[in-house]
From Swiss-Prot:
Disulfide bonds join C88-C119, C95-C114, C99-C120. It comes from the Eukaryota. Pfam families: Defensin_big. It is found in: Secreted. Residues 29-34 form a propeptide. Significantly inhibits the growth of Gram-negative and Gram-positive bacteria and fungi in vitro. This is Big defensin. Its main location: secreted.
Length: 122
């Protein structure tokens, strides 16, 4: 059996909770039912963006706003672009689909940087 003072304490506590719930409702009437529309930053309008940025924009502004602004998802860099037009062999060669007349193909190690292309050195 509980003590009378403890019962009074609990009853006062729950009464205070009920009074607070009546006086301070959890949902304020001042908050509008629909959110205000937020504009996408001008830097992203009509742009093709990376997948991470696209997901962030959709989360922040909504899919309809992102589509209306013309923001598109940039395609994954295709193989020819990711393997062409950069140096190889310690900056002494260049990745190309075919070596030029004054170049020879390097067949040493670490050819993964060129992918399907050839590392052409002078």
């Amino acid at each position: 059996m509980t003590r009378p003072s403890l019962v009074r304490c609990y009853s006062l506590f729950f009464t205070a909770l009920i009074v607070m719930a009546i006086i301070c409702p959890a949902w304020s009437e001042e908050i509008p039912k629909s959110r205000k529309k937020r504009a996408i930053p001008i830097a992203y309008v009509g742009m093709a963006v990376a997948p991470q940025v696209f997901r962030w924009l959709v989360r922040a502004y909504g899919a309809a706003a992102v589509t209306a602004a013309g923001v598109t998802l940039r395609r994954v860099i295709n193989r020819s672009r990711s393997n062409d037009n950069h140096s190889c062999y310690g900056n002494r060669g260049w990745c190309r689909s075919s070596c030029r007349s004054y170049e020879r193909e390097y067949r040493g190690g670490n050819l993964g940087v060129c992918g399907s292309y050839k590392c052409c050195v002078t």
